[in-house]
């Protein structure tokens, strides 16, 4: 991939969620090719000092599925909105449909399969910024609204409304202000009425 200069993504910081060595170099190469600015390893997050307004968490495919789920939970449970509502992107190789859907159900903001053209990957990252994105929050899930992708037998029960409520959060991620909740809607189940 050829490195892109991108005035928007260049102001964002990529947080590499991977092991050191080849996986980290792969994420660094991806970040440079798509025009992302600074790259820091996930373990360095606490030592960054003042966080930039927009972070991208880039999770390497080499992490186990259990590890991916744990990372998503840690990020989505973080008290800082810049972390909790940062785009979490899975960087992967080509996937079969079943595996791809399992990652969608986990709650990734996007899944980028390599190799692909740097411009296309950059555009997909830009799609996470400067627009309202609908998130769903239940007692077991916080992430993008993926209900339109539900298929019979889907496995991510945490995304389903509980007997109590679910919340729709409209998130806007701007370079100047970072992620913000621009609209919140609570929905209670009819059985509780």
Q: What positions do the PLM features span?
A:
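Alpha4 helix (beta4-alpha4-beta5 surface) of REC/receiver domains from two-component response regulators
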Residues: 70, 94-110
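Short beta-alpha junction loops
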Residues: 20, 87-96, 116-118
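Short hydrophobic/Thr-rich beta-strand motif most characteristic of the beta2 strand and flanking loop
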Residues: 35-44
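CheY-like receiver
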Residues: 130-192
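Conserved acidic segment of CheY-like receiver
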Residues: 2-31, 57
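C-terminal output helix
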Residues: 116-125, 137
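Conserved phosphotransfer microenvironments
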Residues: 24, 44-84, 92
């Amino acid at each position: 991939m050829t490195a892109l200069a991108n005035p928007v993504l260049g102001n964002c910081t990529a947080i590499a969620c991977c092991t050191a060595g080849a996986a980290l170099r792969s994420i660094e190469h991806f970040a440079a090719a798509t025009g992302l600015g600074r790259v820091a390893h996930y373990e360095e997050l606490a030592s960054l000092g003042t966080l930039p307004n927009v972070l991208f968490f880039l999770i390497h495919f080499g992490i186990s599925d259990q590890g991916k789920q744990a990372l998503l939970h840690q990020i989505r449970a973080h008290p800082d909105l810049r972390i909790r509502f940062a785009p979490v992107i899975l960087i992967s190789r080509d996937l079969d449909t079943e595996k791809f859907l399992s990652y969608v159900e986990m709650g990734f903001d996007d899944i980028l399969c390599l190799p692909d053209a740097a411009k296309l990957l950059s555009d997909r990252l830009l799609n996470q910024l400067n627009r309202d994105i609908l998130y769903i929050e239940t007692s077991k899930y916080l992430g993008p609204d993926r209900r339109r992708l539900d298929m019979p037998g889907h496995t991510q029960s945490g995304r389903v409304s509980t007997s109590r409520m679910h919340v729709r959060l409209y998130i806007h991620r701007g370079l100047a202000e970072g992620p913000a909740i621009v609209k919140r809607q609570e929905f209670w189940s009819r059985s509780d009425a």
